[in-house]
A protein has these predicted regions:
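Bacterial N-terminal signal peptides
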Residues: 1-8
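Sec/Tat signal peptide C-region and signal peptidase I cleavage site
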Residues: 9-14
């Protein structure tokens, strides 16, 4: 199962306590938009909706609980998953935390979550950027296998794909979320130097990257941002 923590929005951070609130089972664009606005703020995110998601997974959540180094600022942040985002703060005492999300095959992948965010870029701005951390249950036991959790971020046009179900290869020419070495954010593509057990401390996951920044050039006006959590195999 893949989990991605996104940077916080505006607010007052809570030092203790807090909660994780699932938005995944709600079809209301209002609730999905509310979660997405923790990534970029209400002035930047006009609306948001799922372009794809597993039918049984709680794949999107807003959290006010300190976890994995988030929130970086403000009081809340977004959690995007291809399984169950509400399990993120569970103790790591299971070999495989997750859920049977029932995702159909999409472009050669299973359990695909695509969040479509309609954003507005003000005049004078030319960069879209957000901070994130990738966490996974498939490290290290599934490194090099067909099960290859991943995270992609695209702008306006979505072109990622995999060769076929059972093939771990991910092609994403328009992706702008990479690790510090420029690799795709996947279990197979992000090596031991970037995914470690220590970085997942305090979560239910077995491995995580450091906090990373995704950035891409953008022109003023309306755009569509598409963060994607997926699982080839």
């Amino acid at each position: 199962m893949t989990l991605v923590l996104g940077v916080a929005g505006v607010g007052v951070a809570q030092s203790q306590g807090g909660k994780i609130t699932a938005e995944a089972q709600r079809e209301s664009r209002i609730e999905v938009t509310k979660a997405a606005r923790t990534l970029a703020g209400p002035k930047s995110v006009r609306s948001a909706a799922f372009a794809a998601r597993p039918p049984y997974g709680k794949v999107l959540a807003r959290s006010t609980k300190r976890l994995g180094g988030f929130p970086l600022q403000g009081g809340s942040y977004m959690i995007l998953s291809n399984g169950d985002a509400t399990l993120a703060d569970n103790p790591n005492n299971s070999r495989s935390s997750g859920t049977n999300a029932g995702g159909p095959a999409i472009r050669g992948n299973r359990d695909v979550t695509i969040l479509r965010m309609n954003i507005n870029v003000p005049k004078g701005r030319n960069c879209l950027s957000f901070r994130f951390r990738f966490l996974t249950e498939e490290f290290p036991e599934f490194v090099g296998t067909e099960f290859n959790d991943g995270f992609i971020a695209e702008l306006d046009e979505t072109t990622w794909d995999s060769r076929a179900v059972g093939d771990p290869t991910i092609n994403a020419p328009r992706n702008f979320a990479n690790d510090v070495d420029g690799n795709l954010i996947t279990v197979n593509g992000t090596g031991d130097a970037n995914v470690t057990k220590a970085r997942a401390k305090g979560t239910t996951y077995d491995g995580a990257t450091r906090i990373l920044r995704a950035s891409t050039r953008v022109s003023p006006g309306g755009h569509r941002a598409l963060p994607v959590a997926l699982r080839p195999g």
